[in-house]
A protein has these predicted regions:
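TPR-repeat structural position
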Residues: 49, 83, 117, 150-151, ...
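Conserved structural position within tetratricopeptide repeats
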Residues: 27, 57-61, 91-95, 125-129, ...
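Start-of-helix register in tetratricopeptide repeats
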Residues: 34, 68, 102, 136, ...
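Register position in tetratricopeptide repeats
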Residues: 45, 79-80, 113-114, 146-148, ...
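Short coil turns that delineate tetratricopeptide repeat
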Residues: 30, 64, 98, 132, ...
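Single-residue signature of alpha-solenoid repeat helices
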Residues: 14, 52, 86, 120, ...
């Protein structure tokens, strides 16, 4: 039987972790939980979700009462596509903090990704009925609407952005849309960030991804170039840019051009 990739969420103390944007991060066990939370947040903001997962987990080794770290840990598992593991760890967290609304939201999102919409809906509705609604809870509610092809997703995601002005909210909303292949909607959310943060290389990378999926090859190349100009060691942008240049054509873009002429 295959061993799950993040079954135990334990990492070696002396492990070097590459950020993909600068020099490797040396994991130092002498740092406290607040340091690792800050590291997790910084890595999350530039799309290094596996590093962020490691740092959330590291912070919990120091203080298992950090609900923010439990929530972040499950969110990163979801973004890494580890949906069964996300369910497992959200349930473990809820054993420690029963009925915490953000932890209920993490389980709801994991259940949604697995395809159990009934359970996902029950969990997120329960979370939203409690005090202290958060942007994340509304993002999960919005994701459930997207997954079920309902038309209230925009309301939910707009509500999330009202509750939090953090640029991470529209960027991670874009990741939700990308997961469900709603590329134009993802592009719109990234665009909101770029209006205020034109120097965000992660936003440029996501914009390039959206444009590539929409068949806007020339625009995607420009976006990836801008990402690399701002962050020369951005490996994912380099790979995507190379693929676009070497591929020479994109079937989605080809059909778009044909239909424009007809």
């Amino acid at each position: 039987m295959a061993v799950a990739r993040f079954d135990k969420l334990e990492f070696d103390d002396a492990e070097d972790i590459s950020t993909g944007s600068s020099t490797p991060v040396q994991v130092n066990a002498e740092k406290d939980e607040r340091y690792w939370l800050a590291m997790a947040d910084s890595q999350r903001r530039v799309g290094n979700h596996e590093n962020a997962l490691r740092f959330y987990s590291r912070s919990l080794e120091f203080d298992k009462s950090l609900i923010l770290a439990w929530v972040g840990q499950v969110q990163m598992l979801i973004l890494l596509g580890e949906f069964p593991q996300a369910c497992t760890w959200s349930k473990k967290a809820l054993e420690l903090f029963p009925n915490n609304p953000d932890l209920l939201a993490t389980q709801s999102q994991a259940e949604c990704r697995i395809g159990d919409f009934k359970q996902s809906n029950a969990l997120i509705e329960g979370a939203l009925r409690m005090r202290g609604e958060s942007a994340y809870q509304w993002q999960v509610r919005g994701e459930l609407m997207v997954a079920q092809k309902q038309k209230t997703d925009r309301y939910c995601f707009d509500k999330a952005q009202i509750l939090s002005k953090d640029s991470l909210v529209p960027l991670e909303t874009a990741l939700i849309y990308l997961h469900y292949r709603e590329f134009a909607k993802a592009q719109q959310r990234v665009g909101l960030v770029m209006e205020k943060q034109s120097d965000s290389y992660y936003a440029w990378y996501l914009m390039g991804w959206c444009q590539e999926k929409l068949g806007l090859t020339a625009a995607a190349i420009r976006s990836y170039r801008q990402c690399i100009e701002l962050c020369p060691n951005h490996h994912e942008a380099q790979i995507r840019l190379t693929q676009l240049r070497s591929g020479g054509w994109n079937i989605t873009g080809m059909f778009r051009r044909i239909f424009r002429r007809s």
